[in-house]
Regions:
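A domain-level signal for the structural core that forms small-molecule/cofactor-binding pockets
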Residues: 52-53, 112, 128, 137-138, ...
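N-terminal, charge-rich interaction modules
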Residues: 1-75, 84, 91, 149-152, ...
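Extended, charge-rich low-complexity interaction segments
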Residues: 116-140
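Long, charge-dense
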Residues: 79-118, 156-161
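Short, non-transmembrane amphipathic alpha-helical segments
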Residues: 82-87, 138-147
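Gly/Ser/Thr-rich loops at beta-strand to alpha-helix junctions
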Residues: 70-77, 129-137, 160
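Short glycine-rich or small-residue beta-strand-to-loop segments that form or flank ligand, phosphate
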Residues: 64-70, 95-97, 123-129
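Short acidic, glycine/serine/threonine-rich loops at helix termini
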Residues: 106, 137-139, 165-169
């Protein structure tokens, strides 16, 4: 008779998904329109266009750029269009919003691009602890994507998972 310890977690057949795998290493930078406003509040078309013409756009090469205005100013839509047209040759992408909003968007895009076929009829645990903070939006989106295909969905670690969803027997 063998008294060797048995790893019941390893034998459970659970599949663990770590939301941190969707964190990117892309460069995300902000472009604040406030820096191009007269007195930090007013957009003067001629001055703005000249600033856009003389700005060094190569600094954004390969980056994902979040175009926003940190001042409480009214920015005409064409100003965002002009910035986008200047960023297009260099930047990987541009987005209207803050850098944090852009990081969230990129994170969600990766979740939505995930091949859910590998989780079909599996018992899945979505890892809850990690080195990187993961927002609730990620857990919501992972649940939305996986629920239609998994046998069961849990949160936490394999040794102490919280049940979230279980497919009803047909």
């Amino acid at each position: 008779m063998s008294d060797a310890p048995v790893n019941k977690v390893a034998e459970s057949g659970l599949v663990t998904i770590d939301p941190a795998r969707f964190l990117g290493n892309e460069t995300v930078v902000g472009f604040d329109l406030k820096d191009f406003l007269f007195m930090g509040m007013i957009l003067k078309e001629k001055d703005f266009r000249e600033s856009m013409q003389s700005h060094d756009w190569t600094a954004f090469a390969g980056a994902h750029v979040a175009v926003h205005c940190s001042a409480d100013a009214i920015i005409p839509m064409w100003a965002y269009m002009l910035v986008a047209s200047r960023l297009a040759p260099a930047a990987a992408s541009c987005y209207a919003g803050t850098p944090e909003e852009l990081r969230k968007k990129l994170f969600l895009e990766k979740i939505n691009a995930m091949d859910i076929g590998e989780f079909r009829d599996q018992r899945v645990v979505v890892k809850g602890c990690g080195d990187e903070p993961i927002g609730e939006y990620a857990y919501l989106e992972i649940t939305r994507r996986l629920q239609p295909v998994v046998k069961s969905l849990m949160y936490g670690e394999a040794c102490s998972a919280v049940p979230v969803y279980k497919k009803k027997a047909e």
